[in-house]
Curated annotation (Swiss-Prot):
Its main location: mitochondrion. This is Cytochrome c oxidase-assembly factor COX23, mitochondrial. It is found in: Mitochondrion intermembrane space. The keyword Transit peptide applies. The lineage of its organism: Eukaryota, Fungi, Dikarya, Ascomycota, Saccharomycotina. PROSITE patterns: CHCH (PS51808). Keywords: Disulfide bond, Mitochondrion, Transit peptide. Belongs to the COX23 family. It comes from Kluyveromyces lactis (strain ATCC 8585 / CBS 2359 / DSM 70799 / NBRC 1267 / NRRL Y-1140 / WM37). The gene is COX23. A motif (Cx9C motif 1) lies at residues 75-85.
Length: 122
């Protein structure tokens, strides 16, 4: 044996750092019990089918400061939900159709906002 013996650390000391959400909007509600997609008004146009807010100030800022070749998705949480649905349902796309629709609606809202108010997104 050598003078320097390797010491192994107990498993308690080798804890992984907490996983930090990489791109989460602080206004995004992640607690499932507090999420309410039904509107307070009876107007159908106030329905929201996805958790993201693609027109938020934070999303505008992140889009403006990203590099020219970087991809930014303001509907990231909806995207994650659709992939999670696929994983849980053995990649059966028919069972996750609603999640795909929610992601699509979020992207439509974002693109429409960018077209209508270009000066806010540059």
């Amino acid at each position: 044996m050598t003078d320097k013996q390797e010491t192994t650390q107990p498993a308690e000391k080798l804890q992984q750092p907490e996983k930090v959400a990489e791109n989460v909007d602080p206004s995004l509600e992640l607690n499932k019990t507090k999420v309410n997609f039904t509107p307070e008004k009876t107007d159908v146009n106030t329905y929201k089918f996805y958790p993201d807010d693609p027109e938020s100030t934070l999303n505008r800022y992140r889009f403006a400061v990203k590099g020219a070749s970087e991809y930014y998705d303001p509907c990231q949480e909806s995207s994650k939900m659709s992939f999670k649905c696929l994983e849980l349902n053995n990649y059966d796309r028919d069972l996750c159709h609603d999640y795909f629709d929610a992601y699509r609606e979020c992207k439509k809202q974002w693109l429409k906002a960018r077209r209508e108010k270009r000066e806010f997104w540059e």
